[in-house]
Amino acid sequence: MGKNKNYNKNQFKKSKTNNDTTVAQQQQTIEEKPDFKIDGSILEGGGQILRNSVALASLFNKAISIEKIRYNRDQPGLKNQHKAGIDLMSRLFKAHLTGCSVGSCKLYYQPTQKTIQDDGVIEADTKTAGSICLMIQVSLPCLIFAPHSTKMVLGGGTNCDFAPAADYIQNVFLPIATTMGFKCEMSIDKRGFYPKGGGAVTLTTQPLTQPLSPITIVNKGEVNRIVIKSYFTSPRISPLVAERMNNTAKKLIKKDFKKVDVETELIDVSKFSFGDGTFIEIRAYTDQGCIFGATGNGAIGVPAEKVAEDAANSLLKDLQDGGCMDEYLQDQLIIFMALAKGKSQIKTGPISLHTQTSIHITSLMTGAIFTITPLTNNTQSGEETNLITCEGISYFPSDLNNNNNNSNSNTTTTTTTTTISTTTIDNQNSEEK
């Protein structure tokens, strides 16, 4: 066992003053005094900093300023898909928002209401092939704590590079995350491929009756089922392309999992897509309830075999690393672990830069204490395994408490107030775009 690393502190500094005064929405003049000033260039240095900080600022009704947004990217500043997510949150929480324009490297966000109002169906659209799932990531932590059910219809890209696929959220993330006690259903109504976008996803949630339960995923077990699905749009794209993807992925996976049943399926989504495209989804299930996922998007000039190889190799690496989840799931669970009541533990492979970033932002804004414990290496690939432990803050907003009291609930819950402290961390840059 290695030495524990505590992440209950952060280099970010709580802001005391900010003399900038701007004209707010609806012609109101608001003095911008952020509770937190966040350096958007640290660690992963990308959109995840925006999504986590805006989500938590909304939950805790705190004002934030973010500077150096995506500062080390080839094209710094906000992209349209980031702007769409922040605009969505601004509408949900009637926020005072400045600097939220494409290319902006600085923004200020201050929610003016403490919860999402029941105003009917929530609609948002990236207007491009920008990722729908990035809008889900920023909004879901808040939607599940709304005092009423919610329905959200989102437009944009469903299968995008540098973002989770809608299939991954639906088939990997949600089945695992909802074991913490929240109810969320998702449907992919229309596929939106790059570069046209035009996809549609519907997300519904039900109000919680108690804080999130902690999550424990420490026993991987044995892989007992693998599913490979390749999607295509006919007649522009032949089913033979999707079949080549399936065959390539299955051949690679069977080398390591000879005795495991590998299911394959070809799916024509031409009637449910805007534009043409191909996509491969691979999932591995274990006898202990773990789910691993990998995806790949077809592209002009890229052989179908290459798309399948990359997805299959990504899945195989995660399975060989010895953790109980793939590298993409680990960072997406962090914010929910922090908000839960009690101690959560997840066993992972190497700690990704996205996970480090999520831990730092979440620790800063919630006060939740994270510990990363390196575990004895027992994997085929020689990679490290780690145990991420979090003492959650038992977050439960007062309006949900009131709802429960009004319905004579026997559940007793409280909202925990936390104290935030700061420390210094190494500044690292990510090559991700």
Swiss-Prot record:
Single GO cellular component term: nucleoplasm
Record-linked PROSITE patterns: RTC
Subcellular location per the Swiss-Prot or TrEMBL entry: Nucleus, Nucleoplasm
GO terms, biological process: RNA processing
Uppermost EC category: ligase
Record: residues binding ATP: Q137, Y328, L329, Q330, D331, Q332
Segments of skewed composition (Low complexity): 1-10, 401-425
Catalytic activity entry: a 3'-end 3'-phospho-ribonucleotide-RNA + ATP = a 3'-end 2',3'-cyclophospho-ribonucleotide-RNA + AMP + diphosphate
Active site: H354 (tele-amp-histidine intermediate)
Annotated InterPro entries: RNA3'-term_phos_cycl_insert (IPR013791), RNA3'_phos_cyclase_dom (IPR023797), RNA3'_phos_cyclase_dom_sf (IPR037136), RNA3'_term_phos_cyc (IPR000228), RNA3'_term_phos_cyc_type_1 (IPR017770), RNA3'_term_phos_cycl-like_CS (IPR020719), RNA3'P_cycl/enolpyr_Trfase_a/b (IPR013792), RPTC_insert (IPR036553)
GO molecular function, one term: RNA-3'-phosphate cyclase activity
Region listing for Disordered, in residue ranges: 1-28, 400-433
Keywords attached to this entry: ATP-binding, Ligase, Nucleotide-binding, Nucleus
Superkingdom per UniProt: Eukaryota
Biased composition (Polar residues): 18-28
Enzyme Commission numbers on file: 6.5.1.4
PANTHER family referenced in this protein's UniProt entry, alphabetically: RNA 3' TERMINAL PHOSPHATE CYCLASE, RNA 3'-TERMINAL PHOSPHATE CYCLASE
General function of this protein: Catalyzes the conversion of 3'-phosphate to a 2',3'-cyclic phosphodiester at the end of RNA. The mechanism of action of the enzyme occurs in 3 steps: (A) adenylation of the enzyme by ATP; (B) transfer of adenylate to an RNA-N3'P to produce RNA-N3'PP5'A; (C) and attack of the adjacent 2'-hydroxyl on the 3'-phosphorus in the diester linkage to produce the cyclic end product. The biological role of this enzyme is unknown but it is likely to function in some aspects of cellular RNA processing.
Record-stated family: Belongs to the RNA 3'-terminal cyclase family. Type 1 subfamily.
Protein name (Swiss-Prot/TrEMBL): Probable RNA 3'-terminal phosphate cyclase
Gene: rtca
